[in-house]
A protein has these predicted regions:
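A helix-centric hydrophobic-segment signal that preferentially recognizes long
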Residues: 2-201
């Protein structure tokens, strides 16, 4: 009888241990899946935020040739400044990584600032041109949208990068492969470049 009781107790203990192990395994697997899915959602948010920036940058790039053509008629002596703007635009359009894109955008913003300063000082009559005023308004609006999109993107990158660094989520993040490494912020270099391009005259 005692032997039978010990066997039953041993069997019960074995079943309890097996159940606890099974519950732990299920909990770990569920946590792993939940954490992996969180990384996928965060990665998608970062990519969506970058796509939004890309749309506004493309609009900005498309606007610049129209702006240059409009100003050419008024500012014949600003050909070097116009060439710098177009060259900076082309560099920015061909940049691939976030870091390269940020550096190129810094250059383009600086060229646009120089361009607008030169035009506003030397050609005040351009203020009467309806096409120029329309392009100026569009550029100003795009600059605001870009700034807002840049803040949103950087916020998503911060959330993603933080999740990659926190324990124990970092264990899952390190095993997720390509696309799941720390992301770069889309930052402007200096306080002067952080200000929007001044497009008012």
């Amino acid at each position: 009888m005692l032997h039978s009781l010990l066997v039953n107790v041993g069997l019960i203990v074995g079943l309890v241990v097996a159940a606890v192990v099974l519950i732990l395994v299920i909990a770990v697997v569920a946590w792993w899946i939940k954490t992996r899915n969180a990384f996928v959602r965060l990665k998608n948010k970062v990519e969506e935020a970058w796509a939004t920036i890309d749309v506004y940058l493309k609009k900005r790039y498309d606007l610049i040739p129209n702006l240059v053509e409009t100003v050419k008629g008024f500012a014949k002596h600003e050909s070097e400044t116009l060439k710098q703007v177009v060259a900076a635009r082309n560099i920015a359009m061909n940049a691939n990584t976030v870091a390269d894109k940020a550096a190129a955008e810094n250059g383009l913003t600086s060229s646009l600032r120089t361009f607008f300063n030169a035009v506003s000082e030397n050609y005040p009559q351009i203020q009467a041109n309806a096409n120029f005023l329309d392009l100026q308004g569009q550029l100003k609006s795009l600059e605001g949208e870009l700034e807002s999109s840049r803040r949103y993107y950087n916020g998503q990158v911060k959330t993603f990068n933080t999740k990659l660094e926190l324990f124990p989520a970092c264990i899952v993040g390190k095993r997720m492969g390509e696309g799941y490494e720390k992301r770069k912020y889309f930052e402007l270099d200096s306080a002067e470049e952080r200000q929007n391009v001044k497009v008012s005259f």
